């Protein structure tokens, strides 16, 4: 009986670990070896766990306006870096660089840097990174 209990616990732990790994596999959603830059006006800021999102209206080269979803860190992680739910406001004009989504039609980006030109606020995902 103990043997079955141990086998069951090991199997459950393996499944939970696999699920956590899959959840944090950004490579499944984003092209991490590529970088794009988007510029637009903030229409929504979801400051939450496990991931925050910034939504922007971006004017494409052909003049159409497209809404982009930009994935950011979780609220707890961002607070430790000085970001709060008050950091960004609807209407803020921002420039974001990051990894593009695998499906271009999804208009997704995983944020690396953010710059708000009106006051020079900047955020870099990598330690010590400053946005020009």
Show which residues each predicted segment covers.
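Positively charged n-region of N-terminal signal peptides that target proteins for export
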Residues: 1-4
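Bacterial N-terminal signal peptides
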Residues: 7-15
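Short boundary/loop segments of OB/S1/cold-shock single-stranded nucleic-acid-binding domains
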Residues: 20-36
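Conserved hydrophobic positions within beta-strands
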Residues: 40-42
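Short aromatic-glycine-enriched beta-strand elements
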Residues: 48-59
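Short, structured beta-strand/loop micro-motifs enriched in basic residues and often containing a Trp
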Residues: 72-80
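Short nucleic-acid-contacting surface segments enriched for D/E, G, S/T with interspersed K/R
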Residues: 80-96
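OB-fold/S1-family single-stranded nucleic acid-binding modules
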Residues: 101-128
